[in-house]
Amino acid sequence: MRTLFIADLHLSEKHPQISHAFFEFLQNETENVDALYILGDLFEVWIGDDERTLLMNEVALKLSEYALKNNILLYYIHGNRDFMIGKKYAKQSSMQLLPEHCEINLYGKKILILHGDTLCLADKNYQKMRTLLHNPLIQLVFNLLPLFLRKKIGWKIRHASQSKKVYKNREVMDVTKDEVVRLMEKHHVQTLIHGHTHRVACHEMLVKGQAAQRYDVGDWRHNLSYVEVQKDKINLVIRPINFYN
């Protein structure tokens, strides 16, 4: 048996090849799969469950079919692009929403999973913005705005974020190693799986003097990648985006 982890597909109508690869992934990765965990940013942007494009509806349908036809559990942790995904869309997609930092036990192994943006403490401007956007009162007010206005605000936030990335160095946008260790020590785990940075890799490290691993599942811009947890091993799988064609 195995459990799969993906993140950062950033699905949108502008990149149909990624959507196609995701649907092929769901069609083919069914054998001996207990669960699929999506660690955020499945969509490029999400401004509320009341906005439904054809792609959003198709993704919900494909996910629900994947779960129900194959008896596979689906779990979701919000990303920085789609943290407004609510219970309504999650239910339609047969997904269970999880907290931003979540401890799970797989085949006798304790693992900490998260999107990963909370690990990037060097990006102080982003962390300030994140605190603001995750304020429940701010989210309540935002959801009360008309859809067209939310779209405009969402576009401005994304545009500002993309513009600032040009001037940020790689270290600022990467995880803060001390924060990784602190979090793993806090949760008493030797394995951490996350996304967000788009830097697919397995990092060997020490936590409380013991060997530990941090898996970055990567994004799907050029290749598809996922982490596969089995009883006796963990694999980081990287394949061409058209692998299932």
Swiss-Prot record:
<dbReference type="InterPro" id="IPR004843">
    <property type="entry name" value="Calcineurin-like_PHP_ApaH"/>
</dbReference>
<dbReference type="GO" id="GO:0008758">
    <property type="term" value="F:UDP-2,3-diacylglucosamine hydrolase activity"/>
</dbReference>
<keyword id="KW-0444">Lipid biosynthesis</keyword>
<dbReference type="Pfam" id="PF00149">
    <property type="entry name" value="Metallophos"/>
</dbReference>
<feature type="binding site">
    <location>
        <position position="41"/>
    </location>
    <ligand>
        <name>Mn(2+) 1</name>
    </ligand>
</feature>
<feature type="binding site">
    <location>
        <position position="115"/>
    </location>
    <ligand>
        <name>Mn(2+) 2</name>
    </ligand>
</feature>
<dbReference type="InterPro" id="IPR043461">
    <property type="entry name" value="LpxH-like"/>
</dbReference>
<keyword id="KW-0441">Lipid A biosynthesis</keyword>
<keyword id="KW-0997">Cell inner membrane</keyword>
<feature type="binding site">
    <location>
        <position position="168"/>
    </location>
    <ligand>
        <name>substrate</name>
    </ligand>
</feature>
<keyword id="KW-0443">Lipid metabolism</keyword>
<keyword id="KW-1003">Cell membrane</keyword>
<feature type="binding site">
    <location>
        <position position="41"/>
    </location>
    <ligand>
        <name>Mn(2+) 2</name>
    </ligand>
</feature>
<dbReference type="InterPro" id="IPR010138">
    <property type="entry name" value="UDP-diacylglucosamine_Hdrlase"/>
</dbReference>
<feature type="binding site">
    <location>
        <position position="165"/>
    </location>
    <ligand>
        <name>substrate</name>
    </ligand>
</feature>
<keyword id="KW-0472">Membrane</keyword>
<keyword id="KW-0378">Hydrolase</keyword>
<dbReference type="GO" id="GO:0005737">
    <property type="term" value="C:cytoplasm"/>
</dbReference>
<keyword id="KW-0464">Manganese</keyword>
<feature type="binding site">
    <location>
        <position position="80"/>
    </location>
    <ligand>
        <name>Mn(2+) 2</name>
    </ligand>
</feature>
<feature type="binding site">
    <location>
        <position position="196"/>
    </location>
    <ligand>
        <name>substrate</name>
    </ligand>
</feature>
<comment type="function">
    <text>Hydrolyzes the pyrophosphate bond of UDP-2,3-diacylglucosamine to yield 2,3-diacylglucosamine 1-phosphate (lipid X) and UMP by catalyzing the attack of water at the alpha-P atom. Involved in the biosynthesis of lipid A, a phosphorylated glycolipid that anchors the lipopolysaccharide to the outer membrane of the cell.</text>
</comment>
<dbReference type="InterPro" id="IPR029052">
    <property type="entry name" value="Metallo-depent_PP-like"/>
</dbReference>
<dbReference type="GO" id="GO:0009245">
    <property type="term" value="P:lipid A biosynthetic process"/>
</dbReference>
<dbReference type="GO" id="GO:0019897">
    <property type="term" value="C:extrinsic component of plasma membrane"/>
</dbReference>
<feature type="binding site">
    <location>
        <position position="8"/>
    </location>
    <ligand>
        <name>Mn(2+) 1</name>
    </ligand>
</feature>
<feature type="binding site">
    <location>
        <begin position="80"/>
        <end position="81"/>
    </location>
    <ligand>
        <name>substrate</name>
    </ligand>
</feature>
<dbReference type="GO" id="GO:0030145">
    <property type="term" value="F:manganese ion binding"/>
</dbReference>
<protein>
    <recommendedName>
        <fullName>UDP-2,3-diacylglucosamine hydrolase</fullName>
        <ecNumber>3.6.1.54</ecNumber>
    </recommendedName>
</protein>
<feature type="binding site">
    <location>
        <position position="161"/>
    </location>
    <ligand>
        <name>substrate</name>
    </ligand>
</feature>
<feature type="binding site">
    <location>
        <position position="196"/>
    </location>
    <ligand>
        <name>Mn(2+) 2</name>
    </ligand>
</feature>
<comment type="pathway">
    <text>Glycolipid biosynthesis; lipid IV(A) biosynthesis; lipid IV(A) from (3R)-3-hydroxytetradecanoyl-[acyl-carrier-protein] and UDP-N-acetyl-alpha-D-glucosamine: step 4/6.</text>
</comment>
<feature type="binding site">
    <location>
        <position position="10"/>
    </location>
    <ligand>
        <name>Mn(2+) 1</name>
    </ligand>
</feature>
<comment type="similarity">
    <text>Belongs to the LpxH family.</text>
</comment>
<feature type="binding site">
    <location>
        <position position="198"/>
    </location>
    <ligand>
        <name>Mn(2+) 1</name>
    </ligand>
</feature>
<feature type="binding site">
    <location>
        <position position="123"/>
    </location>
    <ligand>
        <name>substrate</name>
    </ligand>
</feature>
<keyword id="KW-0479">Metal-binding</keyword>
